[in-house]
Amino acid sequence: MSNKSSKTSKVSIDLIKQLREKTGVSIKDCKEALRKHDGDIAKALREIQEQGSAIAQEKHNRITVHGRIASYIHINNRMGSLVEINCETDSAANSEEFAKLCQHIAMQIVACPEIKYVKFEDIPEEIKNHYIEVESQSKDLQDKPAQSKNKIIRGRIDKKLRRMCLLDQANIKDDKVTVNDLIKEKINKFKENIQINRFARFTIGEKI
C-alpha cells in the first residue's frame, strides 16, 4: 500500500501539466502514463507517442473530408505559406486546438526551405532514381563491394530525400520530435485521422 502511495505521490500537477503541454492529450491520459512510469516524464511521453502511432496506423485509411486551410506570412513579408490539413469531423476542424496545429504547420513550412513534399512516399520514382544515379558515381564509392556500395547509397539518398519531406522535419518548437510525431500526437488527442494534404511555400523573387 505504501509503495503505491509513493508511486502516486511522484505524479505532481506540474508533471501532468508539462506532459499535457508536450502532447495535448487529456489530463487523465497524462496522469495514467506518469503513474505507470513512476513519474518519469520521458518514458510517459514515449508511451503517449507510441499510442499515437498505433492510433494513427489504425485510422490511416479513414476518410478526411473536413479540415482547414492555414496561411503564414513571415515578419519581413518576403516569405509565406499555405497548407491544407484534413480531419474527419467538423467539430475537430473548428476547434482551437486544430486551428493552432494548422497555423504551426504553416510556420513550419516557411522555416524549412528545402521541403517539396508532404511525405517520402510522395517523391516521384524518377526523382529517387536520379539521386541514386548521381550518388552511385561518387568517387569514394567506386572501390566498394557492390553490397556495401548499395547500402551506403541507400543511406545517403534516404537522408537527402527526407530533407525534402515535411513530415520528416524536426518540429520548430521541439526538435526532439518530428512533424510526423506531432501529427500522431494530435491524432491521439482527437481520436480521428489527420492528414496534411498539400502545401505551398512562397519566397519573393524565387522564380526570377
UniProtKB/Swiss-Prot annotation:
GO terms for cellular component: chloroplast; mitochondrion. It comes from the Eukaryota. GO terms for molecular function: translation elongation factor activity. Keywords: Chloroplast, Elongation factor, Plastid, Protein biosynthesis. Coiled coil: none annotated. It is found in: Plastid, Chloroplast. InterPro entries: EF-Ts_dimer_sf, Transl_elong_EFTs/EF1B, Transl_elong_EFTs/EF1B_dimer, Transl_elong_Ts_CS, UBA-like_sf. Belongs to the EF-Ts family. Associates with the EF-Tu.GDP complex and induces the exchange of GDP to GTP. It remains bound to the aminoacyl-tRNA.EF-Tu.GTP complex up to the GTP hydrolysis stage on the ribosome. This is Elongation factor Ts, chloroplastic. It comes from Cyanidium caldarium (Red alga). The gene is tsf.
